[in-house]
Design a protein with these regions (language model features):
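Topogenic membrane-insertion module of multi-pass membrane proteins
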Residues: 1-77, 90-103
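Long, highly hydrophobic alpha-helical transmembrane signal-anchor segments
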Residues: 30-48, 137-166
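Acidic (Asp/Glu-rich) catalytic motifs at the cytosolic membrane interface
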Residues: 57-88, 143, 184-192, 257
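Short, amphipathic, aromatic/basic-enriched membrane-interface segments that mark the entry/exit
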Residues: 18-26, 86-97, 114-119, 137-145, ...
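Multi-pass membrane catalytic core of lipid/isoprenoid biosynthesis enzymes
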Residues: 73, 78-123, 169-180, 212-215, ...
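C-terminal membrane-associated helical module and adjoining short loops/tails
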Residues: 2-20, 27, 135, 153-300
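Generic alpha-helical transmembrane segments of integral inner-membrane proteins
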Residues: 32, 36, 51, 55-62, ...
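Short, aromatic-rich membrane-interface segments at the entry and exit
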Residues: 46-51, 117-123, 141-145, 166-172, ...
Length: 300
């Protein structure tokens, strides 16, 4: 039955739909991280700058996806999953893809400049890091995991600079731990699902250390959150910061669920799709937002 499912050919999309798919809109939710500093610093009056910075990040990330797909056309065409991407499958003309990438780069820089020069420089830094990752760093075992986490941390820094607030080390530690766990799970999932061809410098013996790294990062998430809730920083921002600790076990439970999915070989090749399709992920996010609202006590 599995073999039959593997032979199904996806329906060829229309040119417009292919262009949209090439931008990878399913990856856009991670750019919401840019707006997290707005929420944690309570800089509500700067919502427009935060929103513009997020849009600039969407443009920047989509440009990177297009350039990567253009550079990896030959390899993607023989990949079991990537061969169905618009450029690799021929649904989108490479010339159109190049034109789209140029428009996104120019548009992303223009929007970032509207926010501030600092945000523009950070967007440019993101592109440089993405280029280094695609060309070399993604093939360096363990360092690639650190770079993956850096992409998410950089989004937080962009968001903080957009609202003209210093970067919170508490926030960096909290978000960094979550995405360190997910990055380790991503590499471990590739090892269990696709074997040697997907290892990028890892071997069969790397699976256990990757899962241990994911587990350690998962344990760090509630520790950071509990310590933050008892800090003077949280006391100055929240009416009842203790409510934040109620999110800790739920977030840790969801991350442990992700680790379990990796262990049994059920991890999707794209962790973002895995999270979007997982009702437990949405439940953890909803509960975290509820705890955030209760900690604020806006009715006071």
């Amino acid at each position: 039955m599995t073999e039959l499912v593997g032979t199904v050919t996806p329906i060829r999309p229309t040119p417009l739909l292919a262009a949209l798919q090439a931008l990878r809109p399913h990856q856009w939710p991670k750019n919401v991280l840019v707006m997290v500093p707005l929420l944690t610093a309570h800089e509500w009056q700067r919502w427009s700058e935060s929103l513009l910075a997020m849009v600039a990040m969407v443009f920047a990330a989509s440009a990177v996806y297009l350039v990567n797909d253009l550079c990896d056309l030959t390899a993607d065409r023989v990949h079991p999953h990537k061969r169905w991407r618009p450029l690799a499958s021929g649904a989108l003309n490479p010339i159109v893809g190049m034109a789209m990438a140029v428009v996104l780069v120019v548009g992303g820089l223009a929007i970032a400049w509207m926010v501030s020069l600092s945000v523009l420089y950070l967007i440019a830094g993101y592109w440089l890091l993405a280029a280094a990752y695609s060309a070399w760093l993604k093939r360096v075992a363990w360092l690639d995991v650190a770079v993956l986490v850096s992409f998410y941390v950089l989004r937080l820094v962009i968001g903080a600079w957009a609202v003209q607030r210093p970067v919170s080390w508490w926030l960096l530690g909290f978000i960094g731990a979550i995405f360190l766990a997910l990055a380790a799970c991503k590499r471990a999932g590739e090892l269990t699902a696709r074997g040697p061809e997907a290892r990028r410098g890892y071997d069969a013996g790397s699976l256990r250390p990757l899962l241990l790294l994911a587990g350690s990062a998962t344990l760090a998430v509630p520790v950071v959150l509990v310590l933050y809730s008892r800090s003077s920083v949280a006391a100055a921002l929240y009416a009842t910061p203790l409510w934040l600790t109620a999110a800790a076990p739920v977030l840790a439970g969801w991350l442990m669920r992700v680790i379990h999915i990796v262990r049994i070989g059920g991890m999707h090749h794209d962790p973002i799709i895995q999270a979007v399709r997982d009702p437990w992920a949405w439940a953890a996010l909803a509960w975290t937002l509820i705890c955030y609202g209760l900690a604020l006590e806006p009715w006071r």
